[in-house]
């Protein structure tokens, strides 16, 4: 896979991640800052590190499965491994400016 192809696929992955929401929060998980790493190998294997706003998120399983299913549908992704991490601990500063405005933090 060329660097141009990889960049195009990674951009599509980000677009797809912006369609995943925590049912309790009206902002997508990407703009919330819950995605820590997107690593696409040349063979299409994808590793994503993500977190939640709270370790005991009741929708965690649903959200992680939604992420995996959606990113695996991206052309060029052969497999997806979604890792749940809690380091660094998520905080409001990880949100995009748009997300902070939407949620009333600015």
Which residue ranges define each predicted feature?
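Domain-level signature for proteins that mediate thiol-based redox and metal-cofactor handling
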Residues: 1-106
């Amino acid at each position: 896979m060329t660097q141009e192809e990889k960049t195009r696929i990674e951009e599509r992955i980000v677009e797809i991640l912006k369609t995943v929401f925590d049912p309790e929060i009206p902002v997508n998980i990407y703009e919330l800052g819950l995605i820590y790493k997107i690593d696409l190998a040349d063979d299409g294997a994808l590793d994503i590190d993500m977190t939640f706003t709270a370790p005991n998120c009741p929708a965690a399983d649903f959200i992680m499965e939604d992420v995996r299913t959606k990113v695996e549908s991206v052309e060029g992704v052969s497999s997806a491994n979604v890792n749940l991490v809690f380091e660094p601990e998520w905080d409001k500063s990880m949100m995009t400016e748009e997300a902070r405005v939407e949620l009333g933090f600015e």
